[in-house]
């Protein structure tokens, strides 16, 4: 579960390291986001000499959450951290690699390119 002002790690090589959530997109007054949701974020930490700078506003897709996710078969899955992948206006990832595992729900919500870049899909 990710909400307003949450800090999340970046799971790709786009140049940002830490993001802060500004808004969870989708729905009227949606306050919490889970795996597969799109969020508007501010870059809090960035790698030097990249296109992304601190304070820049970007969009991202949540790929891992600490809060468990219940699946339709009754199983639960949770991860060690909250992480996201940066996307552009066409819902394509900004980076060329995705680090760490990615939940299967990301593919089901229409981000197949992110799931295909990930080494592990849980």
UniProtKB/Swiss-Prot annotation:
InterPro entries: Ribosomal_uL14 (IPR000218), Ribosomal_uL14_bac-type (IPR005745), Ribosomal_uL14_CS (IPR019972), Ribosomal_uL14_sf (IPR036853). One of its GO terms (molecular function) is large ribosomal subunit rRNA binding. GO terms for cellular component: cytosolic large ribosomal subunit. GO terms for biological process: translation. Signal peptide: none annotated. Transmembrane segments: none annotated. Keywords: Ribonucleoprotein, Ribosomal protein, RNA-binding, rRNA-binding. It comes from the Bacteria. SUPFAM superfamilies: Ribosomal protein L14. SMART domains: Ribosomal_L14 (SM01374). PANTHER family: 50S/60S RIBOSOMAL PROTEIN L14/L23 (PTHR11761), LARGE RIBOSOMAL SUBUNIT PROTEIN UL14M (PTHR11761:SF3). HAMAP family: Ribosomal_uL14. Binds to 23S rRNA. Forms part of two intersubunit bridges in the 70S ribosome. Part of the 50S ribosomal subunit. Forms a cluster with proteins L3 and L19. In the 70S ribosome, L14 and L19 interact and together make contacts with the 16S rRNA in bridges B5 and B8. Belongs to the universal ribosomal protein uL14 family. This is Large ribosomal subunit protein uL14.
């Amino acid at each position: 579960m990710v909400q307003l002002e949450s800090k999340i790690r970046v799971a790709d090589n786009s140049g940002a390291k830490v993001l802060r959530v500004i808004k969870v997109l989708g729905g009227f007054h949606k306050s919490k986001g889970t795996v597969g949701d799109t969020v508007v974020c501010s870059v809090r930490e960035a790698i030097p000499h990249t296109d992304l700078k601190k304070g820049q506003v970007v969009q991202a897709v949540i790929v891992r959450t600490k809060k468990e996710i219940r699946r339709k078969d009754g199983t639960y899955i949770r991860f060690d951290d909250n992480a996201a992948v940066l996307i552009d206006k066409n819902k394509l990832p900004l980076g060329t690699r995705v680090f760490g595992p990615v939940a299967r729900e990301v593919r089901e919500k229409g981000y197949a390119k992110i799931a295909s870049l990930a080494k592990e899909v849980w």
